[in-house]
Design a protein with these regions (language model features):
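Bacterial N-terminal signal peptides
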Residues: 6-17
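Aromatic- and Gly/Pro-enriched helix-to-coil junctions and flexible linker segments
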Residues: 19-121
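N-terminal secretory signal peptides that target proteins for export/translocation
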Residues: 1-2
Length: 121
């Protein structure tokens, strides 16, 4: 009887775990405000330091997706290989660091947005 209850409990847990969905992240409502607050001062053309060094403009969704003179910074659907995520998560040995570090929540929002396809929504 006890084994049956554990089995039933395990099945119920797995069924409920599958029902939990991640929140949909919006570029306009969630991502853009983070970039404006933490990144735009350096990545704003024509004179932002980050823009001058890399060509990366974060002034719009389109310019962000265009990337740098070296290539893209976002791989839609893959935050693990997106340079943006590597930089804000300190997974990349670089001098590119936001003057004001992102919070754990802001990093999670950027990661989830990229993993959800980095859409302009």
């Amino acid at each position: 009887m006890i084994i049956h209850l554990y089995t039933l409990g395990g099945i119920l847990f797995l069924a409920l775990a599958g029902c939990v969905t991640q929140p949909r992240i919006s570029y306009q409502q969630d991502v853009s405000p983070i970039l404006e607050a933490k990144c735009l001062a350096c990545h704003l053309p024509p004179k932002g330091t980050g823009y001058l060094k890399s060509g990366l403009s974060m002034a719009s969704y389109e310019s962000l997706m265009q990337g740098t003179i070296y290539g893209p910074v976002i791989v839609p659907g893959d935050s693990r290989h997106s340079v943006l995520n590597m930089v804000v998560e300190n997974r990349l040995n670089t001098s590119m660091r936001p003057p004001q570090p992102l919070t754990t929540e802001e990093i999670a929002i950027l990661r989830l947005w990229v993993d959800q396809g980095a859409k302009n929504n």
